[in-house]
Amino acid sequence: MSNSGEDFQVVTRKKWMARKCLRRRDRHKSESDYLIDCPDVNVEKFQPRLENLCTEMCQSDYFLVAMEALQQQLEGIRKPLERIVCLGLGPFSRTYHALHQAAFVIGLHRHHKIREALYFDPVFRDSEKELIRLFDGCIMSKDCAGKHEATVPTLYYLPHCPYALMHNILWSNWKRETLPNVFLISNSFEMLTMTPRNQDDHITRIVEHCTETPLEDDYEHHNVFNDLSLHTFPQESLPGSNDEAFWTRCAPLKVNEDELITETETSLAALKLESE
């Protein structure tokens, strides 16, 4: 065991933590660089690839069970869905998870024959916007930061989005007559409220009055749809209109665009694009 002092180095906890933080920073930097530097896709070649994935998605157990859960909740209002609003989908031509989520939204759009599908994400490239249009979607002209009113039965799809975005959807529809029009697929409210938060915000207030249906992540590609639930707000479960304390709106929350982009970069695995 000669020269043991040269062969081995004592690594203190502080040094280990510092290295771990640097590795996280480097990984984040590489993912960020990938999203920026990734070559743009050829729309004509990418369209059939997405179409094939939509077909596979609509045949998956995950999709069929999710559609059944959604249909059960729609029976409560006895109206069809008329609009989809998809916020924070991510750069679906460049990331694996976002690509499968895009296929889910397109499949849902077709399955329920919804007349209007609106999308917004600050990371969308022009090619991704064009693909959305080719699949009968529309790009919202500006960032509404979740401030969108459900004047008709509306499915909001917010996969792994910031807390503020989900809060602002509720804030915009904080009326006993409007909340039943909201069908929200997002991170589980039950899980989110396990972390202590402002007791006056809308997610904390509504959690005991909403119906949450977990969408079990049994999709063949793991972690694409983890921790997502369908949230609905049946009118019979809501407090009466005379409950002024409950129905008084608190302030909307600020959605930091950088936070939305950061969550996209750090939570989605890079999708290797192959030129065909």
Curated annotation (Swiss-Prot):
The modification Phosphoserine is found at S30. The keyword Phosphoprotein applies. The keyword Phosphoprotein applies. GO terms for cellular component: cytoplasm; nucleus. It holds the Pfam family SRR1. The modification Phosphotyrosine is found at Y34. Keywords: Biological rhythms, Phosphoprotein. PANTHER family: SRR1-LIKE PROTEIN (PTHR28626:SF3). Belongs to the SRR1 family. This is SRR1-like protein.
